Amino acid sequence: MSRASRKYLLSLLVFGSNGIIASQISLPSWQIVLLRTLLGGTLLALIVLGARKRPAFLDHPHDAAYLASSGAALGVGWIFLFEAYKLIGVGIASLAYYCGPVIVMALSPVLFHERHTPAKLLGFAAVICGAFLVVAQGKGVALSPWGLVCGGLSAVMYAVMVICSKRASNAVAGIEASAIQLVASFAAVAVFALVAHGSELAVPLSANWPAILCLGLVNTGLGCYLYFSAMGQLPVQRVSVWGYLEPLSAVILSALILGEALTPANVAGTALILGGAIFCEVAGKRRGAEKTSRRLAGSRSASNLAA
């Protein structure tokens, strides 16, 4: 396994523990996200400044704007996600959040002119059924309706984040891109905090500061650094498929460490979500290989005729 692959896997495991660490912080969701983005954004900004190179975003303002929009959506999505963590549990909230890629795939024909194949539609159906199983099983244990809404809105914000990121070119990438996103995330959350909780910004000294620092510096700052620095060195197929290990690790870790119940419906829903997503990726790769083979075959035929 290459170094980039190890870094990417480590970042996914780190992200998968976000909910567990957040559950140890007795602060409002918006305050947790505010501290997280402040600490993580500051760390990455210092790394970029320490490189002593001219930042690429100065020469590519449009890309910077897309990344900033992506970061703002990320911050708002985290507010909803952390609220869902507290109301419906880490496992279900994480899986609801990762319905966001399904929204992106559903909109891809309109936004990115990507054609839906029968295999992709089958994968979509599996993911949607999995999400239904995960959420529907909670009716018997009185899951918070607002918690489910927060989980759904976090998925929508995830989709907005991805769409804005894809609109940006690779001119601004890696740690610089993640720094822009985290700083923009902090700005968006700070505006929300000032408007909605202007007089409540002070964090009590009795807060769990070790958990706050871990979530901000390690899970957000270092996690994003590992994630983005590895992503540029890995095939897109591997990045896409392995990315779904994050919600899986969140579910498993929440069951092992927090003792959250992992019911048969949870297991079946998890399998459908992950299996459907992976099936979509594999089917897309196979279709691309078939197109390449046909193109090469056509080129050989043309060459033979010319000869």
Language-model features: where?
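Hydrophobic/aromatic residues within transmembrane alpha-helices
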Residues: 25, 32, 84, 96, ...
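C-terminal-most transmembrane helix of multi-pass membrane proteins
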Residues: 37, 48, 136-137, 208, ...
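Hydrophobic transmembrane alpha-helices of multi-pass small-molecule transport proteins
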Residues: 44, 48, 68, 107, ...
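Transmembrane alpha-helices of multi-pass small-molecule transport proteins
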Residues: 27-76, 103-104, 156-164, 179-197, ...
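Glycine-/small-residue-enriched transmembrane alpha-helix faces in small-molecule transporters
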Residues: 1-34, 38-42, 72, 76, ...
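Specific alpha-helical transmembrane segments that line the substrate/conduction pathway
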Residues: 31-34, 38-42, 82-113, 154, ...
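Helix-helix packing/entry segments at the starts of transmembrane helices
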Residues: 5, 93-99, 165-186, 220-256
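Loop-to-transmembrane-helix transition segments
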Residues: 3-11, 55-81, 145-154, 202-222, ...
